[in-house]
Amino acid sequence: MQYQSECLSALKSVVNIHKPFEKTFMDAMKLFMAIPDRINFLQLGRYGRFSEQTYRNLFEHETFDWFAFNGSIISKHLTGKRKAIAIDPSYIPKSGKKTPWIGYFWSGCAGEYKRGLEIMGIGVIDIDNHECMTLGSIQTPDCKTLDNMDKNLVDWYSSYLISRKDKIQSISRTVVADAFFSKETFITPMCENDFHVISRFRNDVILYYPTLEQKTGKRGHPKWFDGRIDFANLDLTRCKEYEVNKGKLYGLRVYAKALKRYVSLAIWYPMDGRTDKWQLYFSTDDSMDGREVLDYYRTRFQLEFCFRDGKQHAGITNCQSTDFRKLDFHFNASLAAVNLAKAACKRLGIAYSISSCKSFIHNAYMLERFICVFGINPDMQVIDKLFKELILFTARAA
């Protein structure tokens, strides 16, 4: 099965893996796609080759290098020349009083703060092919824990990314994030550690045109800026216009007062009928082309599709443990299963569909179980003839 071969190939890139761990890990990753319902320890024990306690012990391996595992998959299957790191927090529903770091976090789907957990997903986006695979995830601390660390949420996000910069920067130095991260307290530490950040400004942000005046040789520094930018009356002589399918796109280099630095700005004016007047995207690499800024930012949304697939089909919200190590392993294993499904589809040369992929693997798994428990000598010619038809049965019906 292509899914299993991709998993084994990626696992070999992780150092210090012993044979018992490899067997249990391979079986668990297969079960993330083979189990049709909730994916928890009870279900793993029912469907898997090992006992429930064996899977619980597996999920306690906090030293497993998910970045290396996923990085191996990404290096083979994201083939575009332009890549970037996308980050995005995601709300995970969870109840109980004993769960570590449980608190109130923003749920974009509900449009409000809800009690539960939050993970920050780190993905690699392929701008040329509009694809994304996750590199890893980390659970977000609750407010009480952040207070004990003497940090706010933005500080914690930046400090974690900087702590993993060796692995991240080996893939790309460009980090793409939503408007929540367009704060000086996030941008400055990232830039000081050789990252470039692409994000989005609020519509009322204060930006200035760089001055066009030349040095006169007289005493005193010439003025820095030629005035604040009025986006309702943009000076088109300073901008480069790009052709886009919907609306108008302009790019220019500006000074951002809040960030205390020059940035490359992409201004998109949507078509008539939209309620918003303009959208402002920026890159801290002030030499970046305006169209590229927009392309990078829009590809960021592919990371949210990884979360969607993980929640709907890979059981990312189903972990019932109150152990921090097991929660972390479960979140990362779920997202890695989505990566493996994408890789398997690419290897087979078929269009990616997480639903169809899950149906294929579930059907193949059940057929293998039937053949194993019959206790008779199977007719391999008949099996080879009907195997493909049977595993495709559910997908065709869907």
State each model region's role.
Residues 91, 290-321:
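Short amphipathic alpha-helical "interface-anchor" segments enriched in bulky aromatics
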Residues 8, 13-97, 223-224, 228, ...:
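Electropositive nucleic-acid engagement tracts
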Residues 44, 83-95, 122, 174-182, ...:
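Short, conserved catalytic/metal-binding motifs centered on acidic residues
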Residues 54-57, 108-168, 263-280:
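Electropositive, glycine- and tryptophan-enriched low-complexity nucleic-acid-binding patches
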Residues 316-373:
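Basic, amphipathic alpha-helical segments enriched in Lys/Arg and hydrophobic/aromatic residues
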Residues 142-264, 348, 354-361, 367, ...:
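An internal, acidic/charged active-site-proximal segment
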Residues 28, 34, 277-301:
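Extended, non-catalytic structural segments that build the interaction scaffolds
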Residues 58-134, 248-253:
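Active-site-proximal, Lys/Arg-enriched surface segment
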